[in-house]
Amino acid sequence: YLVSCDLGISHGFNYGYGDNASGGNGWWESCANWQAYKCYPNMQFTDGENFEGHLKFHHLNLLHEDWRYQNCFIQDYWCMKHGSDFIGRLWRESKKPEDPVEAYKRLNKLDQAAFCDEQMEGYMRMATWDIDGVRDQAKHRIGQHVSHLHLAASKEGTWEVDSAYCPQNYGYSIINLNTTAPGTIVKAYFKGIAGAKGYRAINIDKAG
């Protein structure tokens, strides 16, 4: 709201996302909670609220409204990657009708593949919270991501992600592994199964 007051309604995500800026906007809730944690950093991983919600919802789309309050951790990675003032720039330099992902890609001159690579790096760092600014506060939370898996009925040794927790676009999933003896070679093979029964099937020609 304040960005829109200062720079006009075509900035600051005061418009909604989607066609002709007709949708909603929960990103400000995410950034508001993130900003609060910059004022009270010792609470980001200890307040018993948003981190627990993050563990529950991180498979959702990055802008999904169901975790608009708990989606307040990716901002730390974005600031590590692009500077401590980046979230402020993202708000000020957004252009209607961009959503935050579209603005992020434009500001950082990223195509779709490069953006996905950056997100992948960020989520890999979240496995151990190896992110500047939160590394010390979060070290006691390493290993607390929950794996929602079940053995596939058709193949021995094959695991599937539960349909309720399949990662949506820009969501993520972390699978905790049992440790083995040092030097042991471990191999895993991943396969996306587009159109599988029990899962949403939209644009399956672009999935899998």
For the regions a language model picked out, list residue spans one by one.
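Proteins with a high burden of low-complexity, intrinsically disordered sequence enriched in S/T/G/P/A and R
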Residues: 1-20, 53-58, 112-114, 120-127, ...
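Beta/coil-rich, acidic/histidine-enriched accessory regions frequently appended to metallopeptidases
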Residues: 97-208
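Generic low-polarity alpha-helical segments
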Residues: 2-4, 32, 89, 183, ...
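Zinc-dependent metallopeptidase catalytic helix centered on the HExxH motif
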Residues: 1-47
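Active-site-proximal alpha-helical
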Residues: 52-129
